[in-house]
Amino acid sequence: MCGIVGILGRGPVVDKLVASLRRLEYRGYDSAGLATLEGVRIERRRAEGKLRNLEEQLRYCPPSGHAGIGHTRWATHGKPTESNAHPHATENVAVVHNGIIENFRELRAELERNGAGFNSETDTEVVAHLVDSYLKNGYSPQDAVQASLPRLRGAFALAFLFKANDDLLIGACKGSPLAIGHGRGEVYLGSDAIALAPLTDTVTYLEDGDWAVLTRATCVIYGADGSIVQRETSKSGVSALLVDKANYRHFMAKEIHEQPTVAGKTLAHYLDVAAKRVALPLALPFDFNCIQRISITACGTASYAGHIAKYWFERLARLPCDVDVASEFRYREAPLRRGDLAIVISQSGETADTLAALRYAKGKGLHTISVVNVPTSTIARESESVLPTLAGPEIGVASTKAFICQLMVLGVLAVRAAKERGKLSEIDESQLVRELIEVPRLIAAALLVEPQIEKLARYIAGARTVLYLGRGTSAPLALEGALKLKEISYIHSEGYAAGELKHGPIALIDEAVPVVVIAPYDEVFEKTVSNMQEVAARGGKIILITDAKGASEAMVDTLLTIVLPAMVASFTPLVYAIPVQLLAYHTAVARGADVDQPRNLAKSVTVE
């Protein structure tokens, strides 16, 4: 969601602040701002809309302070206006914030009774006035923050800049990530290592409840109880080159085309390629023979990866599997058996609802595995076992390469579970591993259909509604295709299991409705053809994604048939996801949409 950066520099920090905010744009935002210390005075610059609007403000009279904080805001409390943009400040302190202060109304009422004047609709401004109230009573900045933090309910990451203190930043986090970067004579705060990538690769991640007092020479971290704690400092592994578009127009295009490479890299991490067997890089603390049920929780695209994995765990390992949207998991009061397995999936490893689901599952005594793209994330740190995807930083808000790598990891884990439970022979395991090893090559081949899809996208761009249909493992992929299209092109789209067509969605079909059918030639292909015939009979325009056998057997008029390489049916979603992603991307481009930063969306959703 919101992005935070703070810098104590050796020279003017404004350019570094703006550059770091630029790297945080991928998180999603609708306003931006920064504050620097100019002599003893805090100076703020804020702007509604894109970062370029803030840069325009800074162009003619840039601040020269050597200490500052910056922020990209994704509106939660109050409209996306300049007055609601961060930093929020009093005369004595400025603050930037990611998260939600749940008790801000009662705190605001108390502060207003004591004479505080508010200029915004936000929950964050309460934090500035609360800290300021302690400063006015003679507290030091450190003591004022320490006194304020226990009074805040909710999830937050905070960075504070203080009047007349050009060698002091204070950061705090609870339920939202915050990282400290260490440079030569400089120190940094950031929402993640990507924000700090060109400045430093030496990073310390604060843990839940931590707060830190930073100077250019010292970094003291306190736990929630106020005692000094030690946190591990490590190399971030995030290169500035990895957050560059290279020669691509958009990050999403770059990330789609990186998928053969990152899929191969992820597979190499989890397979013994020479022996054609699964070789996890860690020992799982349980035996799959003792697991009676798997619970998978995730949000958005990651949840569709979970739905596809459900087919694999149940078919291959004969292991019952539930899939829940993370925001609902805690509330449906499902009977969970101690000793069973919960798998949580999150690209960022910071998704608030998924983190809450993880904690709920742990509280019920389940073993926990996280599938995350950031192995230093909160979800990773709190999981019993971590299976990282090796997708590299994903900047585009619409997930592509992380989704494919999530499927890779889950597919490998399903094979491991099946083998451990005696449902696969060594020959069976070897065959499935061979199929997985082929996937990067098949993804590369699938990318060759891009010119066809680019032409098709110009037609889809004029549609008001698009339907996606699929059966088996293609049904969740239909849901993912619809999500991709709607989130970046803003065209209304829905995905359905093809068998559900006649139970409602068929009412939408007419000559103006494109219907994307994902149908590899498999055991349910003939049934999917029947659904296509129902669409054709009502004038719907069919776009069929299949293989050569499917194309020859369909015998249905289509607007376009996209032919993918033939492959064994087990892992088709890993390849059939490619044209689905490309169609969403090129349709969004054709409509002139902001592909990498679609409106109202955030890459890392760190509030519930």
Curated annotation (Swiss-Prot):
SUPFAM superfamilies reported in the protein's UniProt record: N-terminal nucleophile aminohydrolases (Ntn hydrolases), SIS domain
Catalytic activity: D-fructose 6-phosphate + L-glutamine = D-glucosamine 6-phosphate + L-glutamate
Glutamine amidotransferase type-2 domain ranges (all copies): 2-217
Keyword Repeat part of the UniProt annotation: yes
Gene3D superfamilies noted in UniProt: Glucose-6-phosphate isomerase like protein, domain 1, Glutamine Phosphoribosylpyrophosphate, subunit 1, domain 1
EC numbers on record: 2.6.1.16
GO cellular component: cytosol
GO molecular function: carbohydrate derivative binding; glutamine-fructose-6-phosphate transaminase (isomerizing) activity
Residues covered by the SIS domain: 284-423, 456-598
Alphabetical UniProt keywords: Aminotransferase, Cytoplasm, Glutamine amidotransferase, Nodulation, Repeat, Transferase
Role summary: Involved in the production of the root hair deformation (HAD) factor specifically on soybean.
Protein name, entry field: Glutamine--fructose-6-phosphate aminotransferase [isomerizing]
Species for this entry: Bradyrhizobium diazoefficiens (strain JCM 10833 / BCRC 13528 / IAM 13628 / NBRC 14792 / USDA 110)
Gene: nodM
